[in-house]
Every structure is written in structure tokens, then in C-alpha cells.
Curated annotation (Swiss-Prot):
Keywords: Lipoprotein, Membrane, Palmitate, Photosynthesis, Photosystem II, Signal, Thylakoid. Residues 1-22 form the signal peptide. GO terms for cellular component: photosystem II; plasma membrane-derived thylakoid membrane; thylakoid lumen. This is Photosystem II assembly lipoprotein Ycf48. Part of early PSII assembly complexes which includes D1 (psbA) and PsbI; not found in mature PSII. Binds to the lumenal side of PSII complexes. Interacts with YidC. A factor required for optimal assembly of photosystem II (PSII), acting in the early stages of PSII assembly. Also plays a role in replacement of photodamaged D1 (psbA). Assists YidC in synthesis of chlorophyll-binding proteins. A 7-bladed beta-propeller torus, about 55 by 55 Angstroms, with a depth of about 25 Angstroms and a central pore. InterPro entries: PSII_CF48-like_dom, WD40/YVTN_repeat-like_dom_sf, Ycf48/Hcf136.
Amino acid sequence: MVIVKSWQKIFTLLVVLLLCIGCSKVPSTSYNPWAVVSLPTEAKLLDIAFTENPQHGFLVGSSATLLETNDGGNNWQPLNLALDDDRYRFDSVSFAGKEGWIVGEPSLLLHTTDEGRSWSRIPLSEKLPGNPIAIQALGTDIAEMATDVGAIYKTTDGGKNWKAQVEAAVGVVRNLERSVDGKYVAVSAKGSFYSTWEAGQNAWVPHNRNSSRRVENMGFSQDGLWLLARGGQVQFSDPANPDEWLDAETPELATSWGLLDMAYRTPNEVWIGGGSGNLLVSTDGGKTWEKDRDVEEVAANFYKVVFLKPDQGFVIGDRGVLLKYQPEAAKTATTEPAA
């Protein structure tokens, strides 16, 4: 009798588990607008940028990886720079017209004024707080650089001189993001808090996380901030009250993979990259979600999503994985008549 009751309990638990998994499954997208791009490397890729020519771009990553495309990102060729060590980690690349910048670790800054045909190294002070991990080209001879402890510097003379924008660093960060209008948000190394900064402020403003879940990544939405937390949670700040947060959403409950990065393609369409080949999309600003299951077999964690323009986007994964957005596939899917 005891054995029968035990089996009944086990059976009931299995049924409940199966029902929960079934109910939590995110619906599939009706089409897949992403194509896997073959790359001549298995290095960890970290950033992508294009020159004023939308066909001409660069990918950067670990082990001094620098790849160049001249056909919009369909094909990439490796470039070797004359550096004293091939173990540099190229963290960030940015272009404004023909002028471009690359920053990396340890303490590396590269500059080009001819669309990347030649690169020169600009020495950085030994007193620089931390290593540069982010660079943003802002115009001719103008760029803004940030380090892994939240120090922010700006040059207006092509990198000859740099002026500190914030008086004190914020501490080691795991992620740092800059908005189009020059605001910053940084997540602490352990994800226990985040900080914000904007021009005119002397120091970073710290903020406690709003739940017990550690913060994975943060960035800027159309009218505030977005936040990805451990356990697959996504959250948006309240447009009416930027200091408050809307209720957290968990697009897929029964999952062990995390959400790693998010980017807007349009004001309403947003994509999230996650671990184990997971890619989610919302077409209503984050209210409901669908999963692109056509890329689930890609053996990579999708840790960076980039949309340079609505019709030009990329998903960067580990082990040399790159997905390219196919606007024609999306256009065809949205114009096909219903069956």
C-alpha cells in the first residue's frame, strides 16, 4: 500500500512537471530572419562596427582577432596587425565616417583615419584607471572611451589628449553601455548593483538592484532602461517614472539558460540573445515573446545583439559564431498572404 502511494505521488509530480514545461514554452516565430555566417576563426568575438560604407565593417575579439568585410558581413577576412603580442583582447570597435577606433586589454588603443587600411597605436598613460573596454567614435577627431572600472575620457584632437568626464571610477564592472545621447549604465562585477552617469554629473550614481536576482546586463530602451537578471528575467523602467521599474517578466519559465543581451531593431521590435543558442523576439515592446527555434542548434551562447540600422543587425556568439540579419526574409514573411 505504501509502495502504491509512493508511485502515485511520483506520477502526480511528473504530470505537474510536464504541464508546467508545456505551459511555459514560448511560441515559435513564424520565420527566421537570421543566417549563420562562416568565419575564419573560433576566437571569442566581442564587437562589430561599420564605416561610412555599409558594406565595409570590422569584427574584433580575443587573441588580437580583427576581421574585415567588404560585402556587408557575408564574408570576412582576417587582418594581422603589427603588435608586440597576439594575446591582446580587442573589446570594442567604433567608426564615424572613415575614422575608427579599437580599444582592448591590456591598455590598448588603436586609431585609423582611412577606413581601417592602416592602424596606429596611441600610447595610454600608466595612470589610466583600469583597462579600456568601450569606445565610441563621435565625429572627426572626437571619441569617448570607458574603462572596466567606469572611468570615462573624451578626446577632441584625434587621441592626442584625453579629458576625464567623471571624477571617480565606479569599481569593476561586468557590463557597460552608452546611449546615443551620451548616458551610461554600468553593472557591477557581481551583479549586485548598477550605476548610471550622464554629462554634467561629477560621479556615478549607484542604484540597488530591485530584486534578489543578480543583474546580468543592462542597456537603454527607447524611453528608459532595460534589465536582464539571472534566471531569465527581463524588466523595463517605467517610462512615466524612470526611477521605478515595471513588473519583471520571465519569457520562458522552464529553462536553465540565461538572458545575456538585448537590442532594439525598431521602437517596438526587440531581440534578446541567451545561452545555448536561444534567441527571443518581441514585436510589442516586450509585452509578449516568441522564440526563434531555427537557431537553437547553433552551438553558442548569444551574448551580444547589435542593430546598426533596422535592416542591418548581427548576433555575436562564442567560438567564432556570427548571425546576420536578413531583412528580405523578414519582409517576405510579413507580406506573405495567410494560407
